Amino acid sequence: MSLKKTLLNIKAFAFDIDGVATDGSVFCSSDGDLLRTYDAKDGFAIRMAVMHGYPVAVITGGSSESIRKRMVTSGVKPDDVYLHCRDKREQFKQFTEKYGLSPEQVMYFGDDVPDVDVLKAAGCGVCPADACLEASEAADLMTDAPGGKGCLREAIEKTLRLQGKWVFDPVQYKAKF
């Protein structure tokens, strides 16, 4: 199937955090919380997807509740933020079943070895420009942007534009967020 047809079939998005939504850097605060930085443009793309009815999930090995807090501010439902994942296939399956989706209808973003099986299972596996070799070989699409620097925005925007849904409605946006 061509990339265009694949993107037209996408009905949901799921992604890893470290190395995808962030650049992979983790800072440890004096109280032991693990802190990350996120690109606001990625957050806006997530909000656009949510605003247009796409389910969005986070499937990460990270375990900090600050991840959930950040993703909820971007519109992700709290119970669609899967933390402390060791076999991401399990949470990917839970997510697809919850929304009645086939794996082929989900775009999954991953950057490292623990993401490879889900990158292969998803309808469109996406990796950032700085992904490891195994992830880049498993992905259907590599973004020009590296992790934490707009890779989510790049592929989500591309998909929504192709589907005619990259449309900003300030009234709807204000009501939702």
Which residues does each PLM region occupy?
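Mg2+-dependent phosphoryl-transfer enzymes with acidic/Ser/Thr/Gly-rich catalytic loops
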Residues: 32-36, 74, 78-82, 89-177
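Alpha-helical substrate-recognition element adjacent to the catalytic core
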Residues: 1-90
